[in-house]
């Protein structure tokens, strides 16, 4: 092995290592910077502020699990179509709308449609 090749390999290794470390630092800093003040609040504050996110027109049972399932369906629908209004329209009128039905039909197997429709009825009474 020539001495020149060894120094070149060492320089290449250092450059790659430096680039990897810089990438890790940037990724760590950006993920730490995305935490909202809601994430940093006290646990009792979190439940109240998260409840405010849901549509006040949902006058039925406030069940966090059911609302979470319905919200996730709308989020998944937005992630598939990437249309700005999909998630908002899907959640409008407490999930009782055509956009929600279309998302449900597109994303969920038919065997779960009835369950989701029952969940909409339960939270939107």
UniProtKB/Swiss-Prot annotation:
Question: What keywords were assigned to this record?
Answer: Amidation, Carbohydrate metabolism, Cleavage on pair of basic residues, Disulfide bond, Glucose metabolism, Hormone, Neuropeptide, Secreted, Signal
Q: Does the keyword Secreted apply?
A: yes
**Which Pfam family is one of those matched by this entry?**
Crust_neurohorm
Could you say which protein family the record assigns here?
A: Belongs to the arthropod CHH/MIH/GIH/VIH hormone family.
The scientific name of the source species is Penaeus japonicus
Kindly indicate where the leader peptide sits in this chain. Answer: 1-34
Disulfide cross-links: 58-94, 74-90, 77-103
| Superkingdom in the source lineage | Eukaryota
Query: Which PROSITE patterns does the record cross-reference, listed alphabetically?
Result: CHH_MIH_GIH (PS01250)
Compartments reported by the entry: Secreted
Q: What is this protein's name? A: Crustacean hyperglycemic hormones 5
Alphabetically, the GO molecular function entries are: neuropeptide hormone activity
Question: Valine amide is carried by which residues?
Answer: 123
Job of this protein: Hormone found in the sinus gland of isopods and decapods which controls the blood sugar level. Has a secretagogue action over the amylase released from the midgut gland. May act as a stress hormone and may be involved in the control of molting and reproduction.
One GO term under biological process is: circadian rhythm
Give the matching SUPFAM superfamilies. Crustacean CHH/MIH/GIH neurohormone (SSF81778)
Provide a GO CC annotation, any one.
Answer: extracellular region
Mind telling me which InterPro entries this protein's record contains?
Crust_neurhormone_CS, Crust_neurohorm, Crust_neurohorm_sf, Hyperglycemic, Hyperglycemic1
- Which tissues does it occur in? Produced by the medulla terminalis X-organ in the eyestalks and transported to the sinus gland where they are stored and released.
Q: Is Signal included in the keywords of this UniProt record?
A: yes
